């Protein structure tokens, strides 16, 4: 391989690594909602990164990179769950990620409680509410999930109602 091709490959690799560093927490959050054991969480994270790497040369920047990352991460996680027959339909989020660190912080406890409730939702509902909590617009959620904007709005309303009902039942 000539030096120009090597430079191009190194440039692509550096760009990819920069993207992964920027979106690492987002990828972990998506993976976190779909698995419990830390070893599996790390394996799933690696699968997502591998799928992102495989798809990176084909990324044409026709959409925001965050949408592209969410789409691949969600699809990888859902595929993983389908393959793993021994993984339960929902997982418990009682261990702490690096994004939930303060044990005595009331806000952190509320977040833990919210994520435990979210974990009881179906796969699509989990994906939708996760994107909503990441401040994605209905249009962005629609593009990532493949649902219509109207369907996203309806589903979000129902998801919020389910979460409110779960909260009251606790």
Regions found by a protein language model. Give the residues of each.
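Short amphipathic alpha helix immediately N-terminal
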Residues: 120-140, 144
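Hydrophobic positions on the alpha-helical face of helix-turn-helix-like DNA-binding modules
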Residues: 48, 72, 128-129, 141-142, ...
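Structural recognition of an alpha-helix C-terminal capping motif at a helix-to-coil junction
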Residues: 29, 43-50, 54, 63-75
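DNA-recognition helix of helix-turn-helix
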Residues: 145-169
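Internal acidic/polar
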Residues: 79, 86-114, 137-138
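N-terminal module of bacterial RNA polymerase sigma factors
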Residues: 1-26, 33
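Pre-recognition alpha-helix immediately N-terminal to the DNA-recognition helix
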Residues: 15, 26, 113-116, 126-127
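Short helix-coil-helix linker/hinge
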Residues: 21, 108, 118-126
């Amino acid at each position: 391989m000539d030096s120009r091709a090597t430079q191009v490959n190194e440039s692509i690799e550096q760009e990819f690594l920069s993207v992964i560093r920027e979106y690492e927490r987002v990828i972990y959050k998506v993976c976190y909602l779909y698995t419990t054991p830390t070893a599996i969480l790390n394996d799933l994270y690696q699968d997502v990164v591998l799928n992102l790497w495989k798809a990176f040369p084909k990324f044409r920047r026709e959409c925001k990179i965050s949408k592209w990352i969410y789409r691949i991460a969600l699809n990888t996680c859902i595929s993983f769950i389908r393959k793993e027959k021994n993984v339960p339909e929902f997982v418990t989020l009682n261990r702490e990620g690096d994004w939930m660190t303060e044990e005595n912080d009331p806000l952190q406890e509320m977040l833990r409680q919210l994520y435990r409730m979210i974990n009881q939702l179906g796969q699509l509902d989990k994906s939708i509410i996760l994107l909503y909590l990441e401040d994605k617009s209905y249009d962005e959620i629609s593009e990532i999930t493949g649902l219509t904007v109207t369907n996203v709005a309806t589903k979000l309303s129902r998801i919020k109602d389910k979460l409110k009902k779960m909260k009251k039942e606790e």
